[in-house]
Amino acid sequence: MIQSFIITGFLGVGKTTMLTNTVKKYFKNKKIAIVVNEFGDIGVDSKILTNVHSEVLEISEGCICCKLAQEFESGVSEIVNKYNPDIIFVETSGASEPFPIFLSLQNLGISIEGIICVVDAKNFDTYKENSTAKYQLGGSNIIILNKVDLVTPAELEEVKKEVIQIKEEYNIKNNLTGETVFNNYMIHYAEQGLVNKEVFEGVYQIDEVIGLAKDYKHLDHTGKDSITQKVAYLKENVRFNDIDQLLSALPKSIYRTKGIVKVTDVPNPIFINYSFGDASYEELPEYKEKSLLIFIGESIADDVKLLSQKFPFLILPQFSINK
């Protein structure tokens, strides 16, 4: 039977990095398929993961829920029939909860080895009140505290305490018995997106057919903490320092920025990964498309417009993505 893992977690917590490192380190001799649920219709993470493995299916629009379940299931079925992979990894959008994906994989008869929620130990305090983040924890049976090398032992202990509290409050329940589903969840630690192989050895396999979770309501993503995305393209003749200055000027409302840009003083296109004030860069020699940046946050339309005025190399489309 084909195995699967669902990788969930809030925006910018390090899901793609963890998945990339996992596939490279532990599954070199396995046939791996990766399904990416991007936020919006421009897939940056899928381009990164394609560099690691060729079988990457992208499901856009931000959330695999009722309207996308059929697309997701047909896409996964096509992967199964065409490639017959040993393991399927599904990386959810940071703006969506994992439970609808769980149901779809169950419908397909695929063994779900674990629902892994990645938590940013350094920045957890900045997003812990977001309802999506809470449902992500509640719908998981494996929790990875990432970036533990960037916090003190006391800070890590406080994050762990808060994670457990949210997990127990938002844990999904069987709608037939009313019992909590993931009582035996596990917490692991990760530094720079690398976790122990034990996480992926199937010791947490989910055998129970849950059906719909008790009191489960799919988030409509239109509430006060709903997440907005804006896309900007870049003019030519942009220098690396221009990008660095832009990222330094981002307001707190924009807590996630990613994209791939071409700059005049670096030979290859650069993948930019910014979250909560921290930025990392990686060269992508194979990228041939336009330079673009994706800004993600809460109520950011005016902020992005101001950025385009301050940094004229940003080009805002006439119709920006707002989902």
Segments predicted by a language model, with ranges:
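Nucleotide-state-sensitive switch-loop elements of NTP-binding domains
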Residues: 2-8, 13, 17-127
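Helical mechanochemical/support elements of P-loop NTPase systems and associated helical scaffolds
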Residues: 3, 68, 97, 136, ...
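Short, solvent-exposed amphipathic alpha-helical segments in soluble enzyme
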Residues: 49-51, 105-107, 134, 248-249, ...
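Hydrophobic side chains in well-ordered alpha-helices
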Residues: 75, 101, 159, 242-246, ...
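Phosphate/Mg2+-binding loops and adjacent switch elements
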Residues: 78, 82-190, 195
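C-terminal accessory "lid"/substrate-recognition subdomains
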Residues: 142, 151-290, 299-300, 314-323
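Flexible loop/N-cap segments at domain edges
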Residues: 295
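C-terminal partner/receptor-binding element of secreted or periplasmic proteins
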Residues: 303-315
